[in-house]
Amino acid sequence: MDGREAMAFPGSHSQYYLQRGAFTNLAPSQVASGLHAPPPHTGLRPMSNPNIHHPQANNPGPPFSDFGHTIHMGVVSSASDADVQPPPPPPPPEEPMVKRKRGRPRKYGEPMVSNKSRDSSPMSDPNEPKRARGRPPGTGRKQRLANLGEWMNTSAGLAFAPHVISIGAGEDIAAKVLSFSQQRPRALCIMSGTGTISSVTLCKPGSTDRHLTYEGPFEIISFGGSYLVNEEGGSRSRTGGLSVSLSRPDGSIIAGGVDMLIAANLVQVVACSFVYGARAKTHNNNNKTIRQEKEPNEEDNNSEMETTPGSAAEPAASAGQQTPQNFSSQGIRGWPGSGSGSGRSLDICRNPLTDFDLTRG
């Protein structure tokens, strides 16, 4: 038929005549319209897999089922060859795995030090003096006080000890605190006091009547003072005094130096005692003297203990020698059934440390 053949498509009633061999580069839309295929576009490429067939070729229509040509469908690529990205670079080579050592790891391993740091580290000088162990000299309490001056070194106290003094109702608080400070040759500092006062006698230095007495009750607001040891007046001589601030029920306050302070109920006074000045030096010297006196006594006691065991060992040895002579044949007998009981008793008396031989009859 002049190089053309008729082809019918499903769903249509008209017949189309197409030239033979025109289906190799036709798109499906062009085949359906019956138009001749235009020249192939540069962006169109034939399908690389020849096994894929158009569904219309596998399903022949009823009028013309022996159509002998195969229609190859190609995939249209919108990207050009220039837009193809290059393949990714190969991954870097993996580092060789370090073989793990067998066994239990060390608890305190040596730090890893590079060769460069070892070479750069300076060598220790053998002539350099070694650092002494312990606290360096000049860091003690006396050295720190010496930096502040001689007056600070001589005025610093030692052996600080806190105290709580309890005064019952009706007792004089000032007299009780003074008697407490006279018990030992130590300075006493009053920190505070709490309680109720029934009456107080204050010293007013500017008035003609130096003693003013007030009747309470009063509440103690503040209570303080100090008693220092008088070096020239004896061990019981003290210098110093007490001061108090009291509050009345109406809110008024009276204060001044204390001459007499009577407690209305239990009053507690917090104080501290310490050694200072020349007493501190004497205290240290006395401690050294006591230690020196104790050391010879301990040496004498040790020498007596060394001589005592030797002298005690001699009577013990003599007693050990006399003990076998007190044994008699009547007190020690042989085993029952043996005919030589008296002979064994004599052997035991001669040598009391001899073991018994159970194999003998």
UniProtKB/Swiss-Prot annotation:
Q: Where in the cell is it found?
A: Nucleus
A Pfam family matched by this chain, by name?
PCC
Question: Motif Bipartite nuclear localization signal: which residue numbers?
Answer: 99-107
In terms of CDD domains, this protein maps to: DUF296
Ranges where the PPC domain occurs: 154-297
Q: What is its main location?
A: nucleus
Q: Which InterPro entries match?
A: AHL, AT_hook_DNA-bd_motif, PPC_dom
Which spans does this entry mark as compositional bias, Low complexity? Answer: 306-322
Q: Which GO terms describe its cellular component?
A: nucleus
Stretches for region Disordered: 29-143, 286-361
Which residue intervals are annotated with compositional bias (Polar residues) in the record? 48-59
> How does this chain assemble?
Homodimer. Interacts with AHL27, AHL29 and ATAF2/NAC081.
Q: What does this protein do?
A: Transcription factor that specifically binds AT-rich DNA sequences related to the nuclear matrix attachment regions (MARs).
What name is this protein filed under? AT-hook motif nuclear-localized protein 12
